[in-house]
Amino acid sequence: MQDQLISSLSSEDSSPSTPTSDAPAKRLSWSKLMQKLHSSQSLDSDSDNHSSTDDSSDSGSICIPDVSQSEFFDPTEEALCKEVVQLIALNLTDAKDGVLHCSKLLIPEKLLEHIGQELVHLSVSEPCGLRGALIDLCVEQDGSCHAAAQIAVDPYLVPTFQLTLVLRLDSRGLWPKIQGLFTGRSPASPAVRRALRLSTGFRAIKRKLYSSEELLIEEC
């Protein structure tokens, strides 16, 4: 038995050793293997982090950026606003023979556009929207304010807020020089009746009818 063991040891000592040229190759292969393992662990870690982020976003609340109320689009409300603006223009035209005492009233398209924007802006926070508006139209003339008309947007609804639009006459720029071109004579009166043109700027005064909050005044 001892002879066999000695013989076995002798045979192992006599076996050819691994060439030294293979050692660097094995070390290189081992380093590549470690790099692959490290890369695999990094990918798994990123995948776990992404998965945990998805899980937390699914289980938790969804973050929604702040959006102001004026940024919401309501087609029905916008269509109603266009109708109200047209009604305002019609009432102003009818007022030329009454409180305004003029032969012609020129209403700039830009003024109507600004009024429409202000109507949407001031009614967006109201419980009934623009339908709950009671609109007073006034025109500043000769140092005083003349009431031209009052419009209940929905006459079957109790108004929730009152909106007073104080319009101004255009007395600047080219208009005073060409105003006479629009002046006419009424058959009922030989006196010359002047033509008026509204300015694009106006004042909006809002008062809530269901609250004791202070008046909101905006220069537009």
Curated annotation (Swiss-Prot):
GO terms for biological process: apoptotic process; dorsal/ventral pattern formation; negative regulation of TOR signaling; response to hypoxia. InterPro entries: RTP801-like, RTP801-like_C_sf. Residues 7-22 have a biased composition (Low complexity). Pfam families: RTP801_C. Its main location: cytoplasm. GO terms for cellular component: cytoplasm; mitochondrion. One of its GO terms (molecular function) is 14-3-3 protein binding. It comes from the Eukaryota. Regulates cell growth, proliferation and survival via inhibition of the activity of the mammalian target of rapamycin complex 1 (mTORC1). Inhibition of mTORC1 is mediated by a pathway that involves ddit4/redd1, akt1, the tsc1-tsc2 complex and the GTPase rheb. Plays an important role in responses to cellular energy levels and cellular stress, including responses to hypoxia and DNA damage, via its effect on mTORC1 activity. Plays a role in neuronal differentiation, neuron migration during embryonic brain development and in neuronal cell death. Belongs to the DDIT4 family. This is DNA damage-inducible transcript 4 protein. It comes from Danio rerio. The lineage of its organism: Eukaryota, Metazoa, Chordata, Craniata, Vertebrata.
